[in-house]
Amino acid sequence: MRTDYCGLIDTRYLDQTVTVKGWVHRRRDHGGVIFIDLRDREGLVQVVIDPDTPEAFATADSARNEFVLSITGRVRRRPEGTTNAKMISGEIELLAKEIEILNAAATPPFQIDDENLSETVRLTNRVIDLRRPAMQKNLRLRYQVAMGVRRYLDAQGFIDIETPMLTRSTPEGARDYLVPSRVHPGEFFALPQSPQLFKQLLMVAGFDRYYQIVKCFRDEDLRADRQPEFTQIDLETSFLNEDDIMDITEGMARQVFHDAMDVELGDFPRMTYADAMHYYGSDKPDLRVSLKFAELTDVMKDVPFKVFNAAANLPNGRVVALRVPGGAKLSRKEIDEYTQFVGIYGAKGLAYIKVNDVSKLTTDETSGLQSPIVKNLTEGVLKSIVERTGAENGDIIFFGADKAKVVNEAIGALRIRIGHEHGEAGGYFVREWRPLWVVDFPMFEYDEDDDRWTACHHPFTSPKPGHEDLMATDPGACIARAYDMVLNGWEIGGGSIRIHRADVQEKVFGALKISPEEQQNKFGFLLDNLKFGAPPHGGLAFGLDRLVTLMAGADSIRDVIAFPKTQRAQCLLTNAPNAVDEKQLKELSLRLRQKADVAGGAA
């Protein structure tokens, strides 16, 4: 029987005989003595095998990396000068008496401690990849976070209730994963994008406080922080307002960070969506970077410089400045790189002014401002730029001028990049956790392609009191009772107070141009049950994968999921998705359309 994990054998076991079991991490032959580093989930222990135990020595001599061994031996102190303070077992070693090979191993596709691996190699050989200490650490952290959430919510009176995995297809903004029904030919279940409607119905049923750590599914284009199947920490409450829900979930975040990482989160300031977009160009601002936008749209409407003038006079245009303290020393090469970078977000260029002497705001060769655009601006405008940005000698000011969406995304991304690259040295970046709440989101946003209003969060979010009538007269001015928890530029949780009256829910559907017939067809079960005394209710969902990615400092969300999909929604380990045979399709009353034969295609 195993005495303890390899990584936990320490000086407590000195002079005792112990048995450990694990994988050969490394094997070394030094002058007739064999050393094996045996690994399990808790770490390594150094095993020494000398020729005085010939049977154990012969077995050790035949062992190779990743063989599975059971080793019994006596614990002794390592010789002076060979200890390793970074390991729990670093002061001791195990002098082997008996070694049993529990299983041999083929040569692994890579060394466990190899850190220079492509993601394709790692995901194809995911089982071996999961043996790496970094992956073990990430998944242990994920477990600790999940357990911390459960402990906290249990203590707060929440009940863990499962909701269906097979449900009906309802529009929630992304494509559904559909599951054909064998019993009902031609009809389909959908895998849930969230438990949203079921958790609201649980509130109508009187459960008061619900939570669930649950899988959700969205068939959408994938990015670094997205997966087709992902895990939510989902909760819903009755009879609480926004402040109550934010207080509860803020407490949960504090406890999880304390228990899992020994981190004390600071204050959670609240910022309106309007302020977040005005100052940071993002509804999930990274407050570690202190740089802010300065609004210049109003002063650029009549300037001779066409780039600024045209943008300032667009109905949805915007002109902003971003002051970078000490940025005048940026090289031409760096500025060119930033110009290319903002182009990714649709910006057509990146104007800038280097501030050499703020006392000389002229437009001629005597100017203390260095830039090709200075001559196209007036002294009054230059003064406004310096005053609004608070620019000082040695600074650089970057400008964004375009549709507001382009400006927000391009200059917002530039703000983050410059902050991370130069902020610590320049005093405008702090390396710590900076949480906040973003509140007062718009209820709707206009989709120009479809010529209609769409829900910013989802169509079950309640408007602020007094805003119900705006849904029919001015949807763009309607504010939602929605809130997002943001941490270091990542939205880690989002929620809202829900609509608990059927008549208000019908008004929202109407504003979204969902006909009464479609409302009843797709959401009749919700509307009908809201009429049976639904309590005021609201909730929030955290993305567990995203939260753990942030806490672990991982490069990708795939580094905190045991068996993730690629950005093409494939599992390289199992080669899923895969074709199925004709018999299975026939049972489901399905027939695949053949791909068009384009050999020698049309001219």
Swiss-Prot record:
It is found in: Cytoplasm. One of its GO terms (biological process) is aspartyl-tRNA aminoacylation. It catalyses: tRNA(Asx) + L-aspartate + ATP = L-aspartyl-tRNA(Asx) + AMP + diphosphate. The keyword Nucleotide-binding applies. L-aspartate binds at residues 172, 218, 457, 498. Transmembrane segments: none annotated. InterPro entries: Aa-tRNA-synt_II, aa-tRNA-synth_II, aa-tRNA-synth_II/BPL/LPL, Asp-tRNA-ligase_1, Asp-tRNA-ligase_1_N, Asp/Asn-tRNA-synth_IIb, AspRS_core, GAD-like_sf. One of its GO terms (molecular function) is nucleic acid binding. Its EC number is 6.1.1.23. GO terms for cellular component: cytoplasm. The record marks 30, 81 as: Important for tRNA non-discrimination. Residues 196-199 are annotated as: Aspartate. Its main location: cytoplasm. ATP binds at residues 218-220, 227, 491, 543-546. Aspartyl-tRNA synthetase with relaxed tRNA specificity since it is able to aspartylate not only its cognate tRNA(Asp) but also tRNA(Asn). Reaction proceeds in two steps: L-aspartate is first activated by ATP to form Asp-AMP and then transferred to the acceptor end of tRNA(Asp/Asn). HAMAP family: Asp_tRNA_synth_type1 (MF_00044). Belongs to the class-II aminoacyl-tRNA synthetase family. Type 1 subfamily. This is Aspartate--tRNA(Asp/Asn) ligase. It comes from Laribacter hongkongensis (strain HLHK9).
